[in-house]
């Protein structure tokens, strides 16, 4: 095919020979099946029930303040002497002030949250004046709360989903868990990405959640590349009808 590239592709870069297309699709299908078989060789660890009530304090847990105290941030900041404002913080490869870190995180095109390995909800990048404009609604009083409190309005079946996500990442059964929230309004693909955070020794240190509307990213990609979704499975095409 490479020796006859002019005949093999049309002016828009699409393969013209249907037999070649079918052959390549079969190769992709076989590869995907192979990956599926190999993945099953590594059996996932069984998921134990998660303690969403923060009953197992870790080294960084502040026990003097109740986790669900709506003024948890202010009280813990006073107890720990937490720095703020223009105080410099040495990071992994850089030095920023606390204000710069705040600005940097708020400028991210995502809603970010972090809960530690004791299932305590410690942080979200509070970039929205109105929580109702968030894809995953959070309010300042939730910082520090137990995960059972943060998700307290969920029915039991969905709380089991929360436990499954945390347990899956804690066990290393998956590198990440991604989901699209159904029932979103037109123009919104409400995407949630849950990623494990690890200590230097490789042990589980908590979970980082990224929430964003994937639709503008998808639209930008298609417009920039001149592609559009094709009817063929797992495919994007140039000039495809």
Please place each PLM-identified region on the residue numbering.
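Glycine-rich phosphate/pyrophosphate-binding loop and the adjoining helix
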Residues: 1-56
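Generic detection of long, well-ordered alpha-helical segments
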Residues: 21, 25, 91, 156-159
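A general structural signal for well-ordered secondary-structure junctions
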Residues: 41, 111, 172-175
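Juxtadomain coupling helices with adjacent low-complexity linkers
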Residues: 55-87, 94-95, 101-105, 211-241
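Sensory modules in modular signal-transduction proteins
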Residues: 86-128
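Sensory/regulatory domains in signal-transduction proteins
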Residues: 116-123, 127-223
């Amino acid at each position: 095919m490479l020796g006859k590239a002019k005949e093999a592709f049309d002016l828009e870069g699409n393969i013209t020979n249907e037999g070649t297309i079918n052959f390549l699709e079969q190769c992709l299908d076989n590869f995907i099946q192979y990956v599926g078989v190999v993945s099953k060789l590594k059996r996932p660890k069984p998921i134990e029930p998660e303690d969403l009530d923060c009953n197992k304090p870790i080294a960084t847990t502040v026990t003097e303040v109740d986790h669900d105290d709506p003024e948890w941030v202010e009280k813990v900041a006073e107890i720990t002497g937490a720095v703020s404002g223009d105080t410099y913080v040495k990071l992994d490869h850089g030095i920023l002030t606390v204000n710069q870190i705040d600005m940097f995180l708020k400028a991210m095109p995502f809603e970010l949250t972090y809960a530690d390995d004791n299932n305590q909800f410690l942080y979200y990048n509070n970039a929205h004046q109105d929580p109702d404009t968030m894809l995953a609604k959070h309010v300042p009083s939730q910082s520090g709360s137990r995960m059972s409190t943060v998700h307290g309005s969920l029915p039991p079946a969905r709380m089991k989903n929360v436990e499954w996500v945390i347990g899956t990442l804690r066990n290393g059964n998956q590198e990440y868990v991604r989901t699209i929230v159904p029932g979103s309004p037109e123009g919104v693909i409400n995407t949630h990405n849950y990623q494990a955070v690890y200590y230097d020794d490789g042990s589980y240190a908590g979970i980082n959640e990224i929430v964003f509307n994937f639709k503008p990213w998808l639209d930008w990609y298609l417009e920039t590349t001149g592609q559009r979704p094709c009817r063929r499975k797992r495919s994007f095409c140039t000039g495809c009808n």
